[in-house]
Amino acid sequence: LFSKSSKTKFIEEQPQKIQLDLSSDESQPQDQLQEMVNEVAEEYEEMVEPDQAEQAAYDPRTDVVETHDQLKQRISRIQYVLANFKEHRNPNLGRPVYIEILKKDVCQLYQYGADTAEILLGLFGPEEFVQFVQACEQQRPLTIRCNTLKLKRKELAQILIAKGAEVEPVSWCHDALTIFKSQVPIGATPEYMRGFYIPQDAASLLPVLALKPQPNEKILDMAAAPGGKSTHICQLMKNTGVLIVNDSNAERIQSLQSNLSRMGCFNSIVINYPGHNIPFTNFNRILLDAPCTGLGVISKDQRVKTNRDKSDLRKMQEIQRRLLWKALDLLDNSNESARTVCYSTCSVSVAENEAVVDYVIKERGDCKIIDTGLTVGRPGLKRFREQQFCPGMELSKRFYPHVHNVQGFFVCLIMKKVGVKCKREYGAKREDK
């Protein structure tokens, strides 16, 4: 059914064969859907290495830079120097000089604002910063999620192949397919209209996989529109239990309801509340795919390059803290409940991810980070600059376009402790301080 020469590269940075567990897809023989994701996302640009005489005294300030090609060349030469600074530097120039020129060149070549570039440079360091930026110039592969409430992935693949599509399974999600070529618009087929599948970025599958919804549970999707993750949750619940689907933006409710209806999600109730004012409680699991700056999805929205600054990070961080705090308040705290919140963003900034989780866990005192169960992704950061994060932060997962060939994403699973009270309400001073 599927080609054995996999083109998909949703993987770890260490090359390895990833075999798909077919235990949940009984219709497929064990010898199919193999040889999935097995190589690192390829390098986006070859590095230019100056000759020995030139590299020993390379001063980027003396370069004539008038064209894009000249900018690219200087970026590559600076990368080369920084990769082994002691050996390749000009003895009259310090490392900050090279880094500052590199940042300015990247901003000019790829049209980034200074604040956005500085945030990314601070996270990645100079070499990986350039790799990330270059990867964001490439579109990610088109993925769809099969609606197993209506048919199996193999059946959907056969239908699309018959229509001239070239498809391949995503190894770490039993319901997802990558579409490489299609003779028909994937978002306008009869099968799409009948709710057989939904186009969904591969990275956006990860939070629901980490949440692990179960049948007959009571689950909340806290910031749900347009509904891709909500319909995924419903699918894993097998249309049982109760799924409360909330979005604070009334203008997005119609599209949310439309997707739920088209996908046949009958266990869902749509509500329209600001996230911090949701009145319902005692949920077994909650998904908070929080509003964010979008610093992981630049390939989808190039405006993020220039319309974000450090003040946006501070404002967004306050919103995220408040929403995560509220989500933990809404959990059922009994032994029988899963008591978990999956916190995710499509941003790579530390301020919106580890820093938010760290603040809430330390200030509340009634919750902890647990393993996401995701087998791909880099570990969350234990520390960043002078900030040491709470224990378990490495159990969270980070995803990058230049490493995993998906949009930039952060996923963290948090469990509420049984019998432990929160130290304070949000916004109040802690009594133990």
Ranges and model annotations:
Residues 1-433:
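S-adenosylmethionine
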